[in-house]
């Protein structure tokens, strides 16, 4: 329970950082990793069972690759690092299992809890494009191309000067649009006029759905996957 509370505090701090500046300080995820290794090492010591510390180390390694895969898909590097932190901190948690995935999730060395947190966070994020679209419609944004129609669900249109102040990432203009921006490459606004309107990333970080998922996954487990499978008759 202590490690769950530490994880909740870490994700809350990360969410605040990400909402304010879209940058997550490294000390957040590093602290989660260090505490996780020490805490699980302590559990192994007092129980004379190496399973806890092994699960923590394996959880960190598996979640490193999961975080890297998320980064390749365009998710911020800070989000992936937080998943690494969860892998070391709380690789396993007594969550309810509602689907046949239970046999896989219950595998001894699989960091099932962080993986389930990411999966549920993806489901929670499904509603975000609808919110972004409605916000654009209310603002009177009118798409001119097929890609701009997609951007209505994925980004916001604003003046370059405003985007710079809000530290957004560039999606582009109607002539050249990129739907998956890179935090390293798509932050140079010098090629645009400051009064020009362009498409940029919305101010809805993925850390927030991760934080929400973290709190709820301990209660619902893989229930959302169960609902999804039942809808499609699987």
From Swiss-Prot:
EC main group: hydrolase
Membrane topology: Multi-pass membrane protein
Described purpose of this protein according to its UniProt entry: Cleaves the N-terminal leader peptide from preflagellins.
Biological processes annotated in GO: proteolysis
Single GO MF descriptor: aspartic-type endopeptidase activity
Matches recorded under Pfam families: Peptidase_A24 (PF01478)
Family: Belongs to the peptidase A24 family. Archaeal preflagellin peptidase subfamily.
Keywords carried by this UniProt record: Archaeal flagellum biogenesis, Cell membrane, Hydrolase, Membrane, Protease, Transmembrane, Transmembrane helix
Protein's UniProt name: Preflagellin peptidase
Gene name for this UniProt entry: flaK
One GO cellular component term noted in the UniProt record for this chain: plasma membrane
